[in-house]
Swiss-Prot record:
Location relative to the cell: Secreted
Single Gene Ontology MF annotation: neuropeptide hormone activity
Gene transcribed to yield this protein: amn
Name of protein: Amnesiac neuropeptides
Propeptide: 33-35, 152-180
Entry function: Required for associative learning and memory in adults. Expression pattern suggests a modulatory role in memory formation. Controls neurotransmitter-mediated signaling pathways associated with the structure of the larval peripheral nerve.
Signal peptide bounds: 1-32
Keyword Transport in record: yes
Tissue: Enriched expression in the embryonic and larval nervous systems. Strongly expressed in two large neurons that project over all the lobes of the mushroom bodies.
The keyword Aminoacyl-tRNA synthetase appears for this protein: no
UniProt lineage: Eukaryota, Metazoa, Ecdysozoa, Arthropoda, Hexapoda
Phenotype upon gene inactivation: Increased growth of the perineurial glial layer of the larval peripheral nerve.
Region ranges (Disordered): 155-180
Gene Ontology biological process terms, A to Z: anesthesia-resistant memory; behavioral response to ethanol; behavioral response to pain; cAMP-mediated signaling; courtship behavior; learning or memory; long-term memory; male courtship behavior
Keywords: Cleavage on pair of basic residues, Developmental protein, Differentiation, Neurogenesis, Neuropeptide, Neurotransmitter transport, Secreted, Signal, Transport
Length: 180
């Protein structure tokens, strides 16, 4: 069972890191693209670009609302011509309205990633992953996390005593000869 855990845990951590990397990579690329367009211009031009982004997102919201009202209006009328026009209206709205993610609060959630994305747009973001280490028997402090990392754990199992003078059974004869 121990060998299974030793193989499974690093594979799970690696898979988790890969998934996190691709998620943040896509988010950073979209955010960096928007930032690159705005940062290319200075002063009032950048402010105008930000306003244009806001107007585009507002117009997308309005089109989505029009689609919803159109769908509700024609929901109860089911004859052939109206259903065809409804399908055309829905397809038109679906083509024109493409939801885009909003990254306005993204810097609050992951400020380190924002700095890396701004500095390293060519090579992509640098993912900084951290997780709690296992509690050590010397510190006598329990972590509040139910699952902890294997980093920092001793190679000797915790049930076996350490080499000490108080417990002579734990010492091998060769070590006893070296200590004298």
């Amino acid at each position: 069972m121990r060998s299974f855990c030793c193989c499974f845990y690093p594979a799970a951590v690696a898979l988790h890191c890969v998934l996190l990397f691709y998620t943040f990579f896509l988010l950073f690329r979209a955010s960096a693209l928007r930032r690159r367009v705005v940062s290319g211009s200075k002063g009032s031009a950048a402010l105008a670009l930000c306003r244009q982004f806001e107007q585009l997102s507002a117009s997308r919201r309005e089109r989505a609302e029009e689609c919803r009202t159109t769908q509700l209006r024609y929901h109860y009328h089911r004859n052939g011509a109206q259903s065809r026009s409804l399908c055309a209206a829905v397809l038109c709205c679906k083509r024109s309205y493409i939801p885009r993610p909003n990254f306005s609060c993204f810097s609050l959630v992951f400020p380190v990633g924002q700095r890396f994305a701004a500095a390293r747009t060519r090579f992509g973001p640098t993912l900084v992953a951290s997780w709690p280490l296992c509690n050590d028997s010397e510190t006598k402090v329990l972590t509040k996390w139910p699952s902890c990392s294997l980093i920092g754990r001793r190679s000797v199992p915790r049930g076996q005593p350490k080499f000490s003078r108080e417990n002579p059974r734990a010492l091998s004869p060769s070590l006893l000869g070296e200590m004298r």
